Curated annotation (Swiss-Prot):
It comes from Homo sapiens. Increases intracellular lipid accumulation. Stimulates expression of cytokines including IL6, MIF and VEGFA. Enhances cell growth and proliferation. This is Hypoxia-inducible lipid droplet-associated protein. The chain crosses the membrane at residues 7-23. GO terms for molecular function: signaling receptor binding.
Length: 63
C-alpha cells in the first residue's frame, strides 16, 4: 500500500511540475510578445549575415 501511495504522490508532483513549467513558458512568451521571437530571429539573422559579410572581404573573390 505504501508503494502505491508513493507512486501516486510522485505522479502528482510530476504533474504539478509540468504545469508550472508550462505556465512559466507561457509567461515568457507573453513578456516577449512586443517583439515575438527576437532571440531566434537574431540568431538566424546572425547566421545568415556572417557568411555574406565574410565572402566579399576575401581578395581572391573580389578579383
Amino acid at each position: 500500500m505504501k508503494h502505491v501511495l508513493n507512486l501516486y504522490l510522485l505522479g502528482v508532483v510530476l504533474t504539478l511540475l509540468s504545469i508550472f513549467v508550462r505556465v512559466m513558458e507561457s509567461l515568457e512568451g507573453l513578456l516577449e510578445s512586443p517583439s515575438p521571437g527576437t532571440s531566434w530571429t537574431t540568431r538566424s539573422q546572425l547566421a545568415n549575415t556572417e557568411p555574406t559579410k565574410g565572402l566579399p572581404d576575401h581578395p581572391s573573390r573580389s578579383m
